[in-house]
């Protein structure tokens, strides 16, 4: 059965699109048919991350306007034949797209692909809300800092209010030494505090930026980052892969971010 995952974050700069591209490639490397949709209208980026910027003729808004058919807008990856990209429009904004438009497009993609990944714009604006009705599940991306975690908690609330299952969480740019010293929140504590399933932890590494400069995704190659991303992909396709934990319980540090009352934990 086909699945559509929306990949979202509270704030920008947490590596959401980088991870979305990597997960799409990781699934394709395992022979899965994958479509990835760039839903960040006006600020597309996945075409560059996937090395496909010179292959775009049509985009998502062209499909909605009827300028082209969906199959004409899909860009097939030259290295991974089971991976296709539906690029965002570069010269439009989110007002050109409705939630019904996204539902129709995702529904059609699910007929031909086993996995549909939708890279949402950061935040909780219209672009994010347009995708809510089209997704089966949500993957939230955060970094282990106060601002990112507070924002992702807000996104999680909107997702569950809409009726979708509790999101899965990826903690990106974790630094083991800082977690062990108590200077950074432990990923498992973040997941427990937000009451989310921890899908995976990706360490911070200069490798990622270097690969982006070479138009390679973060999952390509060998190293700690690639190993972490491959474990996440294997979990997504149903394998039971344990998550290596960084042993430092920094739960006490959350007292400055949360307050507890009779209703439970709330953000300050």
Where are the predicted features?
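Flexible glycine-/small-residue-rich
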Residues: 9, 38, 87-90, 120, ...
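P-loop/Walker-type NTP enzyme "switch/lid" segment
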Residues: 39-111, 210-214, 218-219
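Conserved catalytic-core segment of NTP-binding enzymes
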Residues: 100, 104, 108-111, 115-210
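Short, conserved glycine- and acidic-residue-centered signature motifs
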Residues: 16, 20, 98, 102, ...
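Walker A/P-loop NTP-binding active-site region of P-loop NTPases
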Residues: 4-69, 115
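C-terminal lobe/tail of nucleotide-utilizing enzymes
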Residues: 161-268
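Conserved beta-strand scaffold positions in the cores of enzyme catalytic domains, especially
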Residues: 4, 85, 198-201
């Amino acid at each position: 059965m086909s699945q559509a995952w929306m990949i979202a974050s509270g704030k920008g700069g947490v590596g959401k699109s980088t991870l979305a591209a990597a997960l799409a490639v990781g699934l394709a490397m395992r022979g899965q048919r994958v479509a990835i949709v760039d839903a960040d209208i006006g600020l597309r980026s996945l075409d560059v991350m996937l090395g496909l910027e010179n292959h775009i003729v049509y985009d998502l808004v062209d499909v909605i306007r009827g300028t082209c058919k969906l199959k004409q807008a899909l860009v097939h990856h030259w290295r991974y034949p089971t991976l296709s990209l539906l690029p965002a429009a570069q010269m439009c904004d989110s007002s050109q797209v409705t939630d019904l438009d996204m539902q129709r497009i995702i529904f059609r993609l699910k007929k031909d692909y086993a996995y549909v990944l939708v890279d949402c714009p950061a935040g909780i604006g219209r672009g994010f809300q347009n995708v809510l009705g089209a997704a089966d599940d949500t993957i939230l991306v955060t970094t282990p800092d106060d601002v990112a975690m507070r924002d992702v908690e807000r996104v999680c609330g909107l997702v569950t209010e809409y009726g979708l299952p509790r999101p899965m969480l990826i903690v990106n740019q974790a630094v083991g030494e800082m977690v062990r010293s108590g200077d950074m929140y432990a990923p498992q504590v973040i997941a427990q505090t937000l009451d989310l399933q921890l899908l995976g932890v990706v360490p911070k590494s200069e490798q990622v930026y270097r690969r982006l400069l070479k138009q390679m995704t973060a999952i390509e190659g060998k190293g700690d980052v690639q190993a972490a991303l491959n474990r996440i992909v294997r979990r997504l396709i149903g394998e039971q892969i344990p998550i290596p934990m960084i042993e430092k319980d920094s739960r006490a540090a959350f007292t400055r971010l949360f307050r507890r009352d009779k209703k439970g934990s709330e953000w300050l």
